[in-house]
Amino acid sequence: GDDFGRYTKLEKVTWFDDTNVHKYKNWGKDEFAVKQSFSKNRDAYDDIIAQAASMHGLDKGLVKAIIHTESGFNPRARSGPGAKGLMQLMPATARRFAVTDVYDPAQNIGGGTKYLRFLLKRFNNDLELALAGYNAGEGNVDKYKGIPPFAETQDYVRRVMSRYNKLYGGNTSRLSMN
C-alpha cells in the first residue's frame, strides 16, 4: 500500500515483480541506487568478482553491473520466479553450472560468470545479446533473433549497460573470446 510506496521511494530499492521474466524497476533517481541496507555490500565481493571475472575472461566491472542490477548486492535475494543470490541464478542454471549453494557468494558469482561467458561465446561476443540471454534465456534470444521484445529484458539490458559504462568503468575491449 502507501507505506510500501513511500518505503521504496525513500530506500531506492530494486523491485523484482513476480513474473516469468524478471521486471527490473529501479525506484531510485539514479543508476547508483541500491537499497540502503545493502549499499554496504557494494564492495564486499570485489575479490570474488575479480577472481571469477579473470577466470572467465570477463571485465569485473561488467560482473559488478550485473550484480548491481540483479540483486542490488543482496546475497540472499530471491525473485518471484525463483532466481536466487547475487547473480540471480535460476535453479536449472545453477545446476547446469555446478552451483550447489546459490546463496554462497563465491559459488553464485562463479556460476553466473560461467553462464555469462557461455552466452558471450554463443552470441559471438555480442554483449547486449548475452545480457538479454542472461535475463530472458538464450532460447528467447534465438527465437527473436535478437533482444526479445519484452520490456523487462530491454530495460535490463539498458540498465546493465548504463551501470557498466557509468559506474564500473565499462570497456567492452576487455571482453575476450576465451
Predicted features, each with a name:
Residues 1-15:
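N-terminal propeptides/low-complexity segments immediately following signal peptides
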Residues 17-19:
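A short, surface-exposed interaction/processing loop segment used at functional sites
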Residues 9, 21-22, 26-178:
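Catalytic glycan-binding domains that act on GlcNAc-containing polysaccharides
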